């Protein structure tokens, strides 16, 4: 990417950028996730993001600036803003401690200590099913199913975060063939629960492949694919010829090397 030729995004890069952009619609307190579904030919069928569903279809979203906040019933606008998933996990942790105390298995003086162990160190912390939000992948599947359902089968799903195990089974059932993600998600048990249908091995084509995205990152999309500020053609209509010049400056030095260079520079200045 030296700016000497016109480069446009691949189908996969375009789809992932679309998913990345869709994530910005989310008001979820935990994380913003975006998804995009394409047909086998790369046609974008639908996008989705994680947020709270509203009655009779769709998700809550900002319709227009200045609209009444009372109409927005997302978590950020309820009771000062709270995550229902965290709230329920706290309630479960307290209920377990109450039970252990009432059964005489722990002393009253150790309630707080036991609560912290249960809440922070047990598998309870990984529970995700108490969230009010529809996940981005499900939102995209629902949207695509309503208009282009037949094209989902054999298609691809692009998502900014690795699918959770709940979404994974719906992705498999929908007939999606490949999934590409940007960020890992340690809580997901997708391959553990569905090893018969899901794989992270790109060579296993008899299963739904879940693979890290390879291409221009969405955060760099506009930088790499926007036209040159001075335009692409001259007054005669001929394309400009330009000297090779990096579109983005990224050092290839390792971090320890960079740190040592900085230390040397500071030392030479007596700092």
Language-model segment annotations:
Residues 1-271:
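Zinc-dependent deaminase catalytic domain
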